[in-house]
Curated annotation (Swiss-Prot):
ATP binds at G37, D38, N39, G40, V41, G42, K43, T44. Belongs to the ABC transporter superfamily. Transmembrane segments: none annotated. One of its GO terms (molecular function) is ATP hydrolysis activity. It is found in: Cell inner membrane. It comes from the Bacteria. It comes from Brucella suis biovar 1 (strain 1330). This is Putative ABC transporter ATP-binding protein BR1368/BS1330_I1363. Its EC number is 7.-.-.-. InterPro entries: AAA+_ATPase, ABC_transporter-like_ATP-bd, ABC_transporter-like_CS, ABC_transpr_CbiO/EcfA_su, ECF_ABC_transporter_ATP-bd, P-loop_NTPase. Keywords: ATP-binding, Cell inner membrane, Cell membrane, Membrane, Nucleotide-binding, Translocase, Transport. GO terms for cellular component: ATP-binding cassette (ABC) transporter complex. Probably part of an ABC transporter complex. Responsible for energy coupling to the transport system. The keyword ATP-binding applies.
Length: 239
């Protein structure tokens, strides 16, 4: 079966250095991939590159489309939803329901269809009480959950999540984890919280010096409950 997403020898240069250096990656349907790395190593750049928000060399193929121009990437962004690290970068409409309905409207649904879908989704996610709220009056945790609802409203095949649980209190963290755990779609999740990645993902890679290294998140419960990282041998050149 062909992967949903495939990057082949993709490079992104910035200030004279390769942030991504002939990097290859594939993501299968339903697969949940943890993307790990130090601050500033290029994890966000990689997510942005997948949806065409960074100029890159190499080959990016997604959903059967060999992406060569902005027209191709617009089709990709309808199926690969990117959750920004800062929810204020994602939410710009007056009310929550308007923010959630924005994506479906942009995909061609009528206003009635978009509102019905968005209200139903908010209800299903346990966020129905927020529908009429003014977005900029929400707490940080509420904004993060609403931004997730906004990308899910586009009914994507892949979620690209940039630090989705960062700075959430316990209540909003558990709500976020419950929502993500219930999704039956592929994901790439960037996070510094290995405990959360171990709960949500089934494969891990580490971005270092522009390359991806295969890894495994693991815990030895008989010695320690703390999750730690093992590097593993790759079975071929593509991850």
């Amino acid at each position: 079966m062909k992967p949903l997403l495939s990057l082949d020898r993709v490079s992104v240069s910035r200030d004279g250095r390769n942030v991504l250096d002939k990097l290859s990656l594939s993501l299968a349907a339903g697969e949940r991939l943890a993307l790990i790395g130090d601050n500033g190593v290029g994890k966000t750049t990689l997510l942005r590159t997948i949806v065409g928000l960074e100029p890159a060399s190499g080959e990016i193929t997604a959903f059967g489309i060999n992406c060569r121009n902005e027209s191709d990437f617009r089709k990709i962004r309808a199926k690969a939803a990117y959750l920004f690290q800062n929810p204020d970068d994602q939410l710009f409409c007056p009310t929550v329901i308007d923010d959630v309905a924005f994506g479906p409207l942009n995909l061609g649904l009528s206003r009635q269809e978009a509102m019905e879908l968005s209200n139903g989704l908010l209800h299903d996610l346990g966020l129905g009480h927020l529908a009429g709220r003014i977005t900029h009056h929400l707490s940080g945790g509420e904004k993060r959950l609403v931004s997730l609802a906004a990308v899910l409203a586009m009914q994507p095949q892949v979620l690209l999540l940039d630090e989705p649980t960062n700075a959430l209190d316990e209540k909003h963290l558990e709500r976020m984890l419950a929502i993500l755990s219930a999704q039956k779609i592929a994901m790439i999740i960037v996070s510094h919280d290995w405990e959360i990645l171990e709960r949500l993902t089934d494969r891990a890679v580490v971005l270092r010096n522009g390359k991806l290294l295969p890894a495994m998140l693991h815990r030895h419960s008989q010695w320690s409950e703390q999750v730690h990282l093992h590097y593993v041998e790759a079975e071929g050149s593509a991850l």
